[in-house]
């Protein structure tokens, strides 16, 4: 089921979907008599690619997901923590991705989202002296796991190794929630992950029986104070935002259908 989910979701992502429609449309126009269908597929692929790569559309798709939980605000010296955060016994940083690149420091091997997650986790952990850090993420056989790479970054930024727990077998968010549940029981946790991923992640962790404080980071569709004409542009960053929105909605649909959230 895991690989079936990955296969199906890949072909429903904006770029593979649009390219498939365009390529099949061209083939039908050039090598078959189904000209009407070919034109329809070409038009559909072009329209969808235009929409997905537009800033306004991508923001409209992603912002409602990212706005589900507010970010943890900047800490002020001497000011007390919120009761919800102060009671957390663990800070859980979910995996995202890294490259095994010899000669590069651990932080430079992390993907942009993984780096944002571990930095936010460290920021929160430093205000919780009695809490421990849990890093999550598997790795290919013979290579460093993602959890271990995150842990190396944490130690390089001053977190004592004895405060870090690794969970290295979860292939997706559902498995990560089960692994963390086995480690912490129902102890309150601060759950750190990318903002658009957090609604589904928090739902899965709560479904597993955990007391979760959502801590979003790495927002891709931050709200702005003013509207600018450039907000109507088309760019590859918009494709990234649209892809994140589609991926997360498909992921939430998958777990909802399986009654996990």
Task: Indicate residue ranges for each PLM-predicted region.
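Hydrophobic membrane-insertion alpha-helices, especially the h-region
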Residues: 40-54
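Hydrophobic alpha-helical segments of integral membrane proteins
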Residues: 3-8, 57, 61-65, 246-253
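Extracytoplasmic/luminal low-complexity segments enriched in Pro/Gly and acidic/polar residues
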Residues: 227-230, 240-261
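Membrane-embedded alpha-helical segments of integral membrane proteins
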Residues: 1-30
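Membrane-interface helix-boundary motifs at transmembrane edges
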Residues: 30-38
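Extended, histidine- and acidic-residue-enriched regions that form the cofactor-binding/catalytic faces
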Residues: 1, 17, 55, 259-260
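A structural signal for short, hydrophobic/glycine-enriched beta-strand patches
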Residues: 51-238, 242
